[in-house]
Amino acid sequence: MDGLSKLAFLAAELLMKNEPEGSDTALVFANKSSSLDTDVKYQKSISDAENYFPSPAVFVYTLPNICLGEISIRHQLKSENSFFIFDAFNPVFMANYANLLLNTGKAEKVICGWTEYFNEDYKAFLYLVSKEGKIPHNYQTLEAEYTK
């Protein structure tokens, strides 16, 4: 598993520890560098004609949404999942997208978050939201929590 997938997987584990397997939980993640950390490693493996060794184990992680697949497999999720690329955490988008999924019945719960990983520098900010939440789910709350 690549660094981005490990980061997302471990952060999601904390949120899903009390959730039943196969729950109707959607995943909406974003970051800035996509899968660039793994892309660079893969490019190095194919750049040298004398030492050409493309690794299928590395190649599979050259898409950022693979981390969502790892989480889905672990928790038997068969729900909506999307991975977006933004210059910075976008609380307006996250709140709107998650609320849309909840209000249209596409999911009972949504794990949203920012999982950035590049050159051993990382940040994970994930949260679980449902219609029965105790904290208002809006961009103001998200912005405040993200910047803590």
What are these regions (language model features)?
Residues 28-31, 85, 112-116:
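Short beta-strand segments
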Residues 54-59, 81-89:
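Flexible, glycine/proline-enriched loop segments at strand-loop-helix junctions
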Residues 73, 79-82, 125-148:
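Condensing-enzyme catalytic core mediating Claisen C-C bond formation in acyl metabolism
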